[in-house]
Amino acid sequence: MNPEQLIPTQSTGTSRYFVSYSGIKLPLKLINEITEASLNNWNTYYRGYFDAENRMLLCQKVVYGEVESEHQYQYYDNGVLKLAHIIEDDEVREIHFNEMV
């Protein structure tokens, strides 16, 4: 699978910004939404890109303006998480999930 195929762009989803996330399950659950205008008040924040069904396609942890880590997600047609492509500390991991009916 070509990793470039996973990367959503602004045209494939809407971006929103958050202070943190909760839980340990994937996809991450971003919490405490903030406005784009307030980003300069935060050293660290999470940028999430969401599709029309509000599924997160991409989650980036931004620290001092630089992307420190990111999660790229793909879903089965029924909305269940299919793949998590995680890039952190220059290490890439893929986690495949079974489709649950």
Describe every region a protein language model picked out:
Residues M1-V101:
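Buried hydrophobic residues that stabilize the cores of well-folded domains
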